[in-house]
C-alpha cells in the first residue's frame, strides 16, 4: 500500500477503535479479577503473648488398670497419662500389662494403631527413591519392613524384646506378618515400637537456652516433634505421657499410645533427650548387623546421670545404628547434640555444644543457645543444611528469634516458640505435622506440652503441665 493510501486507512481504524474519540481510560470499565490472596509478611506472625497465661493441669476423667496393677492409664482431656511399675513384674509382664490396659480404652487402640501403621508405610514407600529400591509390589514392601523389624528386634537387649513380646501377646493370638485386618499381629506390634528406626519419616527441631539467658537463671529446653499425623490427624488421638517407674532409673517419655521405645524423654536426674532424623547423602538404608537407636536412647536415660554421659554413650555406639540421626540432650548445666553419624560419607560421630565450630555455610549469633534441626551442623560434617529448605530456613528462623541478649522468662520463651502462625506456606518451625511442642523448665523441674489435636496445629496452643520429671 502506498503512503497516501495508508494514512487515511489508519485514521479510519483509529476512529473505529475509539483511539481518536476523545475517551480516556477513566471511561473504560475496570476488568473483574478474583480477590488477591497475597498477604503482607506481617500477617504470618501471631502477635500473642503468654504473659499471665499459666500452664493447665488437667484432671483425670477416667482410669484404666491392668489386673496385676502394673499399668495404670489416666485419661485426660487432651492426652493419656500412663504409669508402668517396672518393679511389679518381669519385662514380659510389663508389656502385657500395658497392652491389657490399652484394650480397655474407648479409642479402639488396636484398629487405630493398625490403620496408622499402614498409612505411614504407604506414605513412606510412595516416594520415587523408595520405589526405585523396593519396587511397587506390596508383598515386597511388607517383606522389606518385616526384615527390618526382625533384624532390629533381635539386636535389642533381652528385657526390651520380652516387653515387646508381652505387649504383642495381648493382641496377636500368635499371628505374624502384615495383613490389614483390624488386629495387631506380632510383627505389626513390634513395628509400633520401632517406627523411627524402620520407617524414618520425621521433621523435628529444638533449641535450649542456658541460665545466663533466662530470668530464672535456669535452663529452658524446647523440642518440636513432627510426624505424619495420618488421616484427619488420627495420630493425635493417642497423645501420651509414659512414666517408667523404676526407682533411681525412672524415665518419662512423651510419645504416642503403645510405644515402648523413646523418641523424646527425660530421666529423674534431669537428663532430657530427643531424637531427630538426619539421613545420608550417599548411603541407602541398611540395618544389617545394626540395632535400634530409639531403644538406645531409652537405655541411655535409664543408666546415665548427666547430659554429657548420655551423649558419649550414644556417640560411642553410632556405628551400630542403621542410619544417621541427632540426639538433642540437656541437663540443668549443659547441652549437647549427639551427631550420631554412622557412615564416613557424612562425617564422624561427635558431641556438639555451644562452642563447637559450625559448618562454613551456617551463621549463628544467639549466645548461650544451642539449636538442632534435621541435619548435622558441626564443622567438617556432611552438609545437609545448604540446599535443604526445611533445615536451613528453620535454623535461620531460630537464629533470628533468639539472637541478642534478652533474658527470657518461661512465658517469653513460649511466645517466641509460637511466634509464627501455624500451617502457612511461610511457617518454618511449627508445620502441619507437629505432634507436640514440649518444654523442659529446669527452674520448676517440670515438663509442659502443647499437644496438637484433631483440629490441627493452633496458633496459640494451651500448654499443659505434665508434672515434675526430676
Per-segment meaning from a language model:
Residues 1-24:
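Gram-positive cell-envelope targeting signals
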Residues 2-4, 223, 298, 394, ...:
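Basic side chains
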Residues 5, 150, 252, 257, ...:
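Residue-level detector of functional hotspots within protein domains
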Residues 9-11, 229, 400:
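A periodicity- and composition-biased signal for non-globular, repetitive helical segments
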Residues 13, 137-142, 284-288:
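Short amphipathic alpha-helical segments, especially helix-boundary/capping motifs
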Residues 16, 215-216, 228-230, 280-283, ...:
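Flexible loop/turn segments at secondary-structure boundaries
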Residues 19-204, 301-470:
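C-terminus-biased signal that marks the final domain/tail of proteins
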Residues 188-296, 438:
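Internal mixed beta-strand/loop scaffold within catalytic domains of large alpha/beta enzymes
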